[in-house]
């Protein structure tokens, strides 16, 4: 064990360390807020007395919180006030300039968009244009109706039947025509097939004997409305089908043909 640990030493309590003391009228300001601004923690060297230990700011005034800052200090940054605030760089207009400083050309789409935004009426004047014939319409529904019915370029498109050589303008007309080949409506009594449901319904009445359509001028009745409509023409005063041989008139073309086939009186 070293000898220094075995030697008893007496400690003099009356002896104090020689700390440098400040003047009585000086005030030490710790880092805090000075009127809402942060006080710099790095003071100027000439303000401190010799022998101070910590880098704190010292001002010789009785009211430190309302006194002006020492000369040469800025309340915001702690740097000398001669430097002033660092102003932000002016905004650079990079909208139409490239990195070389020359103006970059604006595309046609951007120019059209800028002109449309500058003129609010241009947006209202925007119309729906047909891509086939370049006609414009104020509503989308009007454009759709034009494409379906009235567009000449669209009418040149045709839908062909896979069972025959017929062609149709619309797909709906083609589907109605295909039913004449497939005949989906079949009679359960005799097995006869029809393309339309109303044709099947009229056929079933020939089996049941039902005749719901009666003539108001005579006692005849019919199973189908179209037959009643043709019969009503016989009661009409207008008979537009005339025989060329005897000048006799008929209300229906079928009656005229029957008259000519049976033998016209004038022909003999």
Curated annotation (Swiss-Prot):
SUPFAM superfamilies: beta-beta-alpha zinc fingers (SSF57667). GO terms for molecular function: DNA-binding transcription factor activity, RNA polymerase II-specific; RNA polymerase II cis-regulatory region sequence-specific DNA binding; zinc ion binding. It comes from the Eukaryota. Its main location: nucleus. Residues 1-20 are annotated as: SNAG domain. The keyword Signal does not apply. Phosphorylated by GSK3B. Once phosphorylated, it becomes a target for ubiquitination. Ubiquitinated by the SCF(FBXO11) complex; ubiquitination requires previous GSK3B-mediated SNAI2 phosphorylation. GO terms for cellular component: cytoplasm; nucleus. Repression activity depends on the C-terminal DNA-binding zinc fingers and on the N-terminal repression domain. Transcriptional repressor that modulates both activator-dependent and basal transcription. Involved in the generation and migration of neural crest cells. Plays a role in mediating RAF1-induced transcriptional repression of the TJ protein, occludin (OCLN) and subsequent oncogenic transformation of epithelial cells. Represses BRCA2 expression by binding to its E2-box-containing silencer and recruiting CTBP1 and HDAC1 in breast cells. In epidermal keratinocytes, binds to the E-box in ITGA3 promoter and represses its transcription. Interacts (via SNAG domain) with LIMD1 (via LIM domains), WTIP (via LIM domains) and AJUBA (via LIM domains). Interacts (via zinc fingers) with KPNA2, KPNB1, and TNPO1. May interact (via zinc fingers) with IPO7. Belongs to the snail C2H2-type zinc-finger protein family. This is Zinc finger protein SNAI2. It comes from Bos taurus. The gene is SNAI2.
């Amino acid at each position: 064990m070293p000898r220094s640990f075995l030697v008893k030493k007496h400690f003099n309590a009356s002896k104090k360390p020689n700390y440098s003391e400040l003047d009585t009228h000086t005030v030490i300001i710790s880092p805090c807020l000075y009127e809402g601004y942060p006080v710099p923690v790095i003071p100027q060297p000439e303000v401190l007395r010799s022998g101070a230990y910590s880098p704190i700011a010292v001002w010789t005034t009785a009211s430190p919180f309302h006194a002006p800052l020492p000369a040469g200090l800025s309340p915001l940054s702690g740097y000398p006030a001669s430097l002033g605030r660092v102003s932000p760089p002016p905004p650079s207009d990079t909208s139409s300039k490239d990195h070389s400083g020359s103006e970059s050309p604006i595309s046609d789409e951007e120019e059209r968009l800028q002109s449309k935004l500058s003129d609010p009426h241009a947006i209202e004047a925007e119309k729906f244009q047909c891509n086939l014939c370049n006609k414009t319409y104020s509503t989308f529904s009007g454009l759709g109706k034009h494409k379906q019915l009235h567009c000449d370029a669209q009418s040149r498109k045709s839908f062909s039947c896979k069972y025959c050589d017929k062609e149709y303008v619309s797909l709906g007309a083609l589907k109605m025509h295909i039913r004449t080949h497939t005949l989906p409506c079949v009679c359960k009594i005799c097995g006869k097939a029809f393309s339309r449901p109303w044709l099947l319904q009229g056929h079933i009445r020939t089996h049941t004997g039902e005749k719901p359509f009666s003539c108001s001028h005579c006692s005849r009745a019919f199973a189908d409305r179209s037959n009643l409509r043709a019969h009503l023409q016989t009661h009409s005063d207008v008979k537009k089908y005339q025989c060329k041989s005897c000048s006799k008139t008929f209300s229906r073309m079928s009656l005229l043909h029957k008259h000519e086939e049976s033998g016209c009186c004038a022909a003999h």
